[in-house]
């Protein structure tokens, strides 16, 4: 059963099952040429909100070493329902809204439902290695399907051109899979994990 926290902005209800801190493990397996990289890792994922109509997201992964955990990778970003920004939303930058905040009731949020019975979502992620991703997709019940709409790379970043991600709430755990197109390779399986709610 998924509990909806008191004070959660109505726009976040379709994503509310993600809220909290999750911890578990996963595996990365990716072939480049004749070499295949395979690593198991531990992972901690956090989804939170600060009263605004988006989720704050962070993921930190580590590899178990002989002397304890060794930092591996991290990413951070924001998840929200995909809709046109209105005068009731802040921005750009630090500009305040000039109208009432939109989509504050369940009835108003239901108008954002798509033809498939889900809600369109967008996810903006930043990686410290010089890659930023914008994903678009859909949340339907306790499943999220995402595909990159845009990838930005700094001059020094490794080659990375696109990705898809899948998230699902299964047996009270968060399962995910991440396919990537990188290092001159087409889109293919890259990593997956299973994390449990710890907070």
Curated annotation (Swiss-Prot):
InterPro entries: Calycin, Nb(III)_bact/plant, Nitrobindin, THAP4-like_heme-bd
Subunit architecture: Homodimer.
Source organism: Clavibacter sepedonicus
Protein family per UniProt: Belongs to the nitrobindin family.
Functional description taken from the UniProt entry: Heme-binding protein able to scavenge peroxynitrite and to protect free L-tyrosine against peroxynitrite-mediated nitration, by acting as a peroxynitrite isomerase that converts peroxynitrite to nitrate. Therefore, this protein likely plays a role in peroxynitrite sensing and in the detoxification of reactive nitrogen and oxygen species (RNS and ROS, respectively). Is able to bind nitric oxide (NO) in vitro, but may act as a sensor of peroxynitrite levels in vivo.
EC id: 5.99.-.-
Motif GXWXGXG, chain ranges: 20-26
Catalyzed reaction equations: peroxynitrite = nitrate
EC top class named in words: isomerase
Name the record gives this protein: Peroxynitrite isomerase
Keywords of this entry: Heme, Iron, Isomerase, Metal-binding
Binding-site list for heme b: 158, 190
Disulphide bridges, residue numbers: none
Signal peptide: none
PANTHER family registered for this protein in UniProt: PEROXYNITRITE ISOMERASE THAP4, THAP4 PROTEIN
Cofactor(s) essential for the protein: heme b
GO molecular function: heme binding; metal ion binding; peroxynitrite isomerase activity
Pathway involvement of the protein, from the record: Nitrogen metabolism
Cofactor: record remark: Binds 1 heme b group per subunit, that coordinates a highly solvent-exposed Fe(III) atom.
Name of one Pfam family that matches: THAP4_heme-bd
Domain notes: Forms a 10-stranded antiparallel beta-barrel structure able to accommodate a hydrophobic ligand in its interior. In fact, this fold hosts the heme group, which is located in a wide surface cleft.
């Amino acid at each position: 059963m998924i509990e909806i926290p008191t004070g959660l902005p109505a726009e976040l209800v379709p994503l509310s099952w993600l809220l909290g801190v999750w911890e578990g493990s996963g595996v990365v397996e990716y072939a480049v040429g004749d070499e295949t990289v395979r690593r198991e890792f531990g992972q901690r994922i956090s989804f939170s909100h600060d009263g605004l109509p988006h989720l704050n997201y962070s993921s930190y992964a580590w590899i178990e070493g002989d002397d304890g955990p060794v930092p591996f990778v991290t990413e951070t970003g924001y998840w929200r329902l995909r809709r046109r920004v209105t005068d009731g939303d802040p921005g750009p930058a630090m500009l305040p809204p000039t109208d009432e905040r939109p989509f504050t009731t369940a009835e108003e949020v239901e108008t954002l439902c798509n033809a498939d019975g889900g809600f369109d979502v967008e996810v903006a992620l930043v990686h410290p290695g010089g890659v930023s991703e914008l994903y678009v997709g859909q949340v339907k019940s306790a499943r999220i399907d995402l595909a990159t709409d845009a990838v930005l790379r700094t001059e020094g970043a490794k080659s990375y051109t696109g990705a898809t991600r899948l998230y699902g709430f299964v047996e009270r755990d968060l399962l995910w899979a991440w396919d990537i197109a990188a290092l001159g390779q087409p889109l293919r399986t890259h990593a997956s994990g299973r994390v449990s709610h710890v907070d």
